[in-house]
Every structure is written in structure tokens, then in C-alpha cells.
């Protein structure tokens, strides 16, 4: 992986893209709580004719800590990351906590964005107390619960086991901080001021951030688009990767220069 020194942090990332169409904005992918860049499937990371940058937030994946427990602080890290890459204009895509980061970024730095894609997100992201406390006090059982609730009930066991293994590679204190960041996130009152083109994506069987939250976002962000994906839960981009990639491709075409 490549890495960038950003202030007192090092951010690792992978860059993808050949035969890039200069009229299409680059895509920056931000993972969710306790995740890393591999939470984005190959179909999304390897979009045709598009430069794609998938980062590991500090304390996640190949990026050393410290992490943070505040969405706006993560948003500033993303800002510094794209500054270091000299990306003046791009589409920011985020899953779950990454979706909160994308919304926060759009509200703070709209002039930098071509668009955002929020996958499995919400304007408010309260985390249930058993998950918050369990991450610290019973990591094994809590990560198993998170995994179960992150997928459609009919998802093959092997696929869920792979996700669980990735999740358990994370530092419990980093995952706890991520959940605190999500729990304190609330932009309900600010949604009417969001002017960045937005695509909201959610699995119809999402039990972590139910579809109603994406529908709410769509109804309160003018001109936004909504994709509800059947046979998918919270990790919709892993469960139905081609459908999510195709929708992102179509959305990119609309916001290209």
C-alpha cells in the first residue's frame, strides 16, 4: 500500500484506475467503523475509466493510530488526505460511519465535491448501549452480533466469517471510538443546507441502519437519488457489489464535467 504523512498521522491507501477519463471526478472511498479499505469490493474499487482512492482511516487496516472518536475530526483527516493527493474535485463515498463522514464533509467543504454516495447511512446514527459497552467488555460476542446484523439472513456463513475475521483484527478501543463518533453524529437540522449531489444506497434488509434512514436522507436532501437494494443488509456493497458499482458508475456519469 501507499502512504501519506498528514500532520502527526500516516494514512495508508490504495490507488486504482487505468485509462482514466479526465471528465469524470476521482472517487475517494471511506470505510465504516472498525473497517478498512477492503470493505469496498473489487467491483467498486476498480471502476472503469475512473481514478479511485481507498484509504484506511488512522488506527484502521494498515494506517497506524491514533484514531479519533469524532466524525468531524475524521472528516478533517479526509480533507487533509485529498489535499495531499492534490484532488481539487472528487466524489466522496462512505459506508456507515464513512457515510457520516461524507455527509459531514459535504456540509463543511461542499466546494471540494462533485458528489457524495452514502451507503447504509443516516442523518443520526445512535448506537445501542449493548454494542457500545460490549465492544470493550465482550469483544468476541459483540463482534459476532455486529456481523450477524450486518448481513442479509441468507448470506452464506463463509462470507460472514470473512467479515468477522476482518472486524476482529481491529483494536477494540478503536472500534469503541468509532461507535462513539457515530453515536454523537447528528446532522438532522442541517440537511436542508446540503447542496452537493447525493446518492443514498441501502440494503432493504439492513438491520443496522434500516432503509427508513436512507429514505429520510433522500426526502430531506434536494435533488438526491435513492437506491434500495433487495437481498442485502448493512454491507450491501459486499452483498450486491455489481449493483452498487453499476449505480455508482451511472451516478458518476451524471456529475462528470
List the predicted regions and their residue ranges.
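Catalytic histidine neighborhood in serine/cysteine hydrolases
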Residues: 219-234
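Flexible "cap/lid" loop of the alpha/beta hydrolase fold
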Residues: 100-144
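Conserved acidic catalytic loop of the alpha/beta-hydrolase fold
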Residues: 73-90
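Conserved alpha/beta-hydrolase catalytic His-Asp/Glu region
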Residues: 133-195
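Catalytic histidine-centered segment of alpha/beta-hydrolase-like enzymes
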Residues: 232-245
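Short beta-strand/loop motif that positions the catalytic acidic residue
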Residues: 194, 200-202, 206
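Conserved alpha/beta-hydrolase "nucleophile elbow" surrounding the catalytic nucleophile
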Residues: 31-33, 90, 94-96, 203
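Conserved HGGG/HGGXW glycine-rich cap/lid loop of the alpha/beta-hydrolase fold
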Residues: 9-64
